[in-house]
């Protein structure tokens, strides 16, 4: 949302514990609400209402583009392993093509908090979190072969050069 100039860094939402839209109520996990929250406090407190509003302003198709940049809906190892699942991050076109239905705004809200049609793998979420923590810098996992020490207690491996350096 920041990247698309939909919200500013100072954007705040008043969380009352729910958001009502078109006769539907979307609840925050904190029933009494978080009060007024900005992006930082919304992340820290996991305020659903903040992300509902941010998603509403962004729209599901732009949300999908951003999610894809973080690896959601894409295989981590491309086609290296046939067992690996790509997950799913929906869009208006996806729903029309796969379910024959139009997109509903409420679906955008719940997609914005990772619910609804969203499907991710634990590794995708781990890498997305690492990318956020590293200022947008992607960290790719490194696969290692079975190189064990004689005692078979520890795996020997080399650190990948794309890991953050200690300063």
Where do the PLM segments sit?
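Beta-lactam-recognizing serine transpeptidase/beta-lactamase-like catalytic domain environment
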Residues: 2-167
């Amino acid at each position: 949302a920041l990247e698309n100039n939909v919200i500013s860094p100072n954007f705040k939402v008043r969380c009352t514990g729910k958001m009502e839209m078109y006769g539907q109520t979307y609840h925050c996990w904190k029933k009494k609400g978080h009060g007024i929250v900005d992006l930082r406090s919304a992340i820290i407190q996991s305020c659903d209402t903040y992300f509902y509003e941010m998603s509403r302003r962004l729209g599901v198709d732009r949300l999908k583009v951003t999610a894809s940049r973080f690896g959601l809906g894409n295989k981590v190892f491309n086609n290296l392993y046939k067992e690996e699942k790509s997950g799913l991050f929906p869009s208006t076109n996806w729903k029309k093509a796969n379910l024959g239905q139009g997109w509903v705004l409420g679906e955008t809200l719940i997609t914005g908090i990772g619910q609804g049609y969203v499907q991710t793998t634990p590794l995708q979420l781990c890498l997305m979190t690492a990318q956020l923590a590293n200022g947008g810098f992607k960290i790719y996992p490194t696969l290692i072969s079975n190189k064990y020490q004689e005692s078979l207690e520890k795996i020997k491996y080399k650190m990948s050069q794309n890991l953050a350096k200690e300063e």
